[in-house]
Amino acid sequence: MALTLRVCSTFLRSCSSNSKSVLSGLSSVRFRSSCPVLISHLDHLVLTVRDLNKTTKFYSEVLGMEVVTFKGDRKALSFGEQKINLHQVGKEFEPKAQTPTPGSADLCLITKTPLKAVADHLKACGVTIEEGPVDRTGAVGPISSLYFRDPDDNLIEVSNYQQ
């Protein structure tokens, strides 16, 4: 790996007059890990929230997620092949994050719905758009994004992959 990086670095330096144009064409650089553990996808994450009812209403009405009740009265938000488990602050399930805090998340959600339609729907739901649409870099390529907040002030980014 060190040799590969050294060769790449030497190549870029040798293209000194060209290096800015070479680098400007790169949207991101990925390095392969030698770790034997390969993660395939995210199954679920946990949001700590102040009010389960406000949160489930927001995510179901504004973002179309399905509210799921499991293991008695636990709540989750289901979409695609993922879910967001909800923990009410002060009533978290073990094990839990070291400092579970409402409003500390920053989530990027991908949709195929055009962002204009998303923006119109957000406005109709009384949700304030903080920014966007703006161009960003997603996990698998360029995206266009809208930013807004959920009832706990988590930052929510809804994005389309650019063609």
Curated annotation (Swiss-Prot):
Annotated CDD domains: GLOD5
Record-annotated VOC domain positions: 41-161
UniProt-listed InterPro entries: Glyas_Bleomycin-R_OHBP_Dase, Glyas_Fos-R_dOase_dom, GlyoxalaseI/FosfomycinResist, VOC
Domain of life: Eukaryota
Gene3D superfamilies: 2,3-Dihydroxybiphenyl 1,2-Dioxygenase, domain 1
Protein family according to the UniProt entry: Belongs to the glyoxalase I family.
Protein name according to UniProt: Glyoxalase domain-containing protein 5
Species: Danio rerio
